[in-house]
């Protein structure tokens, strides 16, 4: 994998992980309940779940790479279009990320490491969009002919690191700026910035594909 591909992947991963989703909302909820530091335990569980999902995605991707170059290119195209779809969806969203933070049933015990860990793991494994996203995104950065397992490990580790950074950011920000983040106007601006960036990245991936086809 070339350094330029990895840097582009990290840019996409940062946009994905910093865009509000179930794992981010869980980090916000736990940060309010038990503090940002303890909230990162649930983020560790989420990261572990992402490695499991990546393994499942890798198994399917290995079959695609081994059997059909055309299918591989179609999957890359689907990945780029999926980024555009996510961008449009994010742009149209008007909800406040803090206002939507879920109330964790049975308030987490600050001393219960495994309870927090299981929360994050469950959120990752029960998100039906996760494996679809991994299967659609990773082909954009996989180099055919090189070991798939190694490339998936590098990409997954990078993605999890970006996710942990995003969760740490939101956990601390939600604790300090809960009222400001709940303002509809600012929430709308945040969603549109993320959505526009998604669309631009998706279009750039389509252009890269056209040049290399």
Regions found by a protein language model. Name each.
Residues 3-73, 136-155, 160, 171:
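Juxtamembrane transmembrane-helix termini in multi-pass membrane transport proteins
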Residues 67-98, 160, 166-174, 178-213:
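Selective transmembrane alpha-helices of multi-pass membrane proteins
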Residues 35-44, 106-108, 119-122, 183-186, ...:
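Juxtamembrane helix-capping/reentrant segments at transmembrane boundaries
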Residues 14, 18, 51-55, 88, ...:
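Hydrophobic/aromatic residues within the transmembrane alpha-helices of Major Facilitator Superfamily
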Residues 37-115:
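Membrane helix-loop-helix hairpins that form the core translocation module of multi-pass transporters
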Residues 123-135, 195-198:
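Core segments of transmembrane alpha-helices
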Residues 21, 35, 127-128, 183:
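Short loop-to-helix capping motifs
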Residues 2, 6, 109-117, 130, ...:
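Primarily residues marking transmembrane-helix entry/exit sites
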